[in-house]
Amino acid sequence: MQTITVNDAVGQALAEEMRRDPRVLTFGEGVATNRRDLLAEFGAQRVRNTPLAEGIIAGAAAGAAAMGLRPVIDLLYAPFLTLAMDAIMNSAGKLRYLSGGQFEFPMVVLARTGAGWTVGGQHNHNLEAMFVHAPGLKVVMPHSTADYKGLLKSAIRDPNPVLFFMDMTVGHTPGPVPEGEHVVPLGQAAVPRAGRDVTLVSYSKSVTTCLAAADQLAQRGIDAEVIDLRTLKPLDEATILRSVRKTGRLIVVHEAAAPCGVGAEVAAIVGEKAFASLKAPIRRVTGPDAPAPSSWMLEQAALPQADGIARAALELVGAETVPA
């Protein structure tokens, strides 16, 4: 086991896949500058910078993928994915179906999201639910350092376009990663903490918040199970349903706003397939339906907090107060 940062885990995944498959290449905003080791090893034909032109970058990637390459593009900040929607949704997402399977689009789109850098609404907007709704796309949002590497390797090998959202605050966060080949299948959730009283479902950085809430709940004798979705599309319904049938209570947590979000989809699945197991109404703890603030204090206030999650869980099990 090695201890490396998230940025290094992503770099390892890219390097290993580029060595394994000569069709893999990477380009985008600052790629050759930020990945000088890849540029030195693989050259400018496979590692290159681009202008700040998200639509052109995504369009070039879709064309390269259709012609048999496996591009990994970096568009930096998630809000600017809106400038690449046509290439990602209408070309890469649909043309495999529209061509009767004659074309595949094995491309990965890297984008950073999440609060913590006080970059304001221009650079911080959680758009994952929008892409979950688009046919033909897969959507990944890792939490652990090991999953950043393992899920990226799976995304690169997948024959479909994959949106790979990275939390912008965790790049220098160290964590354990297995040595050598480490691949995590898409569509499989993780259960970093087992429990019997309430299920906390989350993804990306909010998993850490859920684990902190579970620690608070343990002080009150409440045993919370935490599920890290890892992949938002395809969604691991089986793991969610198995947990809810055991605990009878569900709270979904994410930084994105509540309306039509991932939490709403998880709640709908449980309502349709495990309603009889529920002992209490499903709860969502989310960010507000508002642009991201630039103030650090306001940004922190807008994030789901462990206290709020614990309080919601206590209400579901019939307790009244959260520990000080």
Each language-model region and where it sits:
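Thiamine diphosphate
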Residues: M1-P161, F165-M166, ...
